[in-house]
């Protein structure tokens, strides 16, 4: 084990930037302001948790309301940073993330599933006010007012954003339609994939040409710790979100549970997330904050979060295609009396109200087999996270001071 800066400098520059020298002293924040800022941040995480846990339990009822099993994947959201001193703020946010898994079931069963969205409005308003009023740069105690409005506007990377949105839209729509609504060789699906490739190529070119001003700076993407963290985060979160979305379908379609019962039965998964599994979700943020200079941490953290959100949307759409294709295949194999179109329009809840008793057992078995095979895909995606994990540098989160400069401890 070596504790000198020379070990840090011997690493390739594209792999690990040198640790910052003379790190800025953080300016303190009054406890009452910190408390309100934590409360606003926790509300923001709570809103994200609502999108995931509420919608996962309400989606079977939503598919029944709109007579469309094809829309399972649309509910996917289209979160957390800490350093050594941030565990105290991260723990309550992680706990809040899983506290209300049954709320969506209660809304869907006793009120209306639309409240799954309405509830975000007041919470989002409170969050916005608190963050705007109390957030400041911990290094200087103020926001950066020296930057002109034009430079701030350029920093938004508007051209990249305008290209990225249709790129992701075409990919998601192609994955949702392919093999389900239309065959994979259908012209609509092919055109969507072609647009995705062309627009994606243009977006990559813009990111490369803008260099550090890009939304995703190429310099950071080439850093092994950043792309490894992004791969790990995308796979592990994508796998978890598939399980979170399809367990309620199994609970309601196979076990015949109500939305509230579904929210209760999924609590062991949520409790496991709070107690231990959530620990793995924080590893990429620890990695980039340990390996990179302080000036690069915000952008690198945003890249990891971007990979997380993108994987949620893409992998849920892919899982929907797998689920629906396998469901139709099992239904055709088990019973010739069931029309697949009738299965789509019935939705994933209250199957006994749509099908007779002589075909219902076959449909339930088909649902169970289709959900199980979707979980196989989630397991494979989780295994792919090791690709990112094994490429991370072996660094210690502890830092020592050498001649006033921060030095990384290599293991």
From Swiss-Prot:
It comes from the Eukaryota. GO terms for cellular component: plasma membrane. One of its GO terms (molecular function) is transmembrane transporter activity. Keywords: Cell membrane, Glycoprotein, Membrane, Transmembrane, Transmembrane helix, Transport. It comes from Penicillium fellutanum. It is a multi-pass membrane protein. Residues 1-19 have a biased composition (Polar residues). Residues 1-26 are annotated as: Disordered. The lineage of its organism: Eukaryota, Fungi, Dikarya, Ascomycota, Pezizomycotina. This is MFS-type transporter phqF. The chain crosses the membrane at residues 34-54, 116-136, 155-175, 189-209, 231-251, 266-286, 299-319, 370-390. Efflux pump; part of the gene cluster that mediates the biosynthesis of paraherquamide, a dichlorinated fungal indole alkaloid that belongs to a family of natural products containing a characteristic bicyclo[2.2.2]diazaoctane core. Signal peptide: none annotated. The keyword Transmembrane helix applies.
């Amino acid at each position: 084990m070596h504790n000198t800066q020379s070990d840090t400098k011997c690493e390739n520059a594209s792999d690990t930037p040198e640790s910052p020298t003379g790190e800025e002293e953080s300016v303190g924040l009054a406890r009452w302001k910190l408390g309100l800022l934590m409360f606003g941040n926790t509300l923001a995480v709570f809103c994200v948790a609502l999108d995931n846990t509420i919608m996962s339990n309400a989606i079977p009822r939503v598919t029944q309301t709109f007579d469309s099993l094809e829309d399972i994947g649309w509910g996917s959201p289209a979160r957390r940073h800490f350093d050594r001193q941030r565990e105290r703020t991260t723990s309550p946010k992680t706990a809040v993330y899983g506290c209300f898994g049954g709320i969506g079931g209660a809304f869907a069963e006793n009120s209306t599933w639309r409240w799954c969205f309405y509830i975000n409005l007041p919470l989002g308003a409170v969050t916005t006010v608190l963050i705007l009023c109390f957030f400041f740069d911990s290094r200087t105690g103020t926001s950066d007012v020296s930057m002109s409005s034009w430079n701030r506007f350029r920093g938004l990377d508007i051209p990249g954003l305008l290209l990225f949105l249709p790129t992701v839209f075409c990919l998601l729509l192609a994955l949702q339609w392919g093999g389900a609504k239309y065959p994979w060789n259908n012209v609509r699906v092919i055109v969507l994939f072609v647009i995705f490739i062309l627009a994606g190529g243009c977006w990559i070119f813009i990111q490369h040409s803008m260099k550090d001003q890009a939304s995703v700076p190429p310099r950071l993407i080439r850093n092994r710790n950043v792309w490894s963290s992004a791969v790990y985060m995308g796979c592990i979160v994508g796998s978890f979100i598939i399980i979170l979305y399809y367990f309620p379908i199994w609970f309601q379609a196979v076990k015949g549970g109500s939305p509230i019962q579904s929210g209760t039965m999924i609590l062991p998964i949520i409790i496991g997330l709070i107690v231990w599994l959530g620990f793995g979700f924080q590893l990429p943020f620890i990695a980039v904050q340990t390996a990179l200079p302080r000036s690069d941490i915000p952008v690198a953290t945003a890249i990891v979060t971007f990979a997380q959100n993108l994987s949620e949307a893409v992998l849920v759409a892919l899982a929907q295609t797998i689920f629906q294709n396998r469901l139709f295949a099992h239904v055709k194999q088990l019973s010739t009396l069931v029309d697949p179109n009738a299965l789509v329009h019935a939705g994933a809840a209250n199957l006994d109200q749509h099908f007779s008793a002589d075909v219902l057992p076959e449909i339930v078995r088909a649902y169970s087999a289709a959900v199980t095979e979707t979980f196989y895909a989630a397991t494979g995606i989780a295994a792919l996270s090791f690709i990112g994990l094994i490429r991370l540098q072996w660094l210690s989160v502890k830092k020592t001071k050498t001649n006033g400069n921060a030095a990384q401890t290599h293991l």
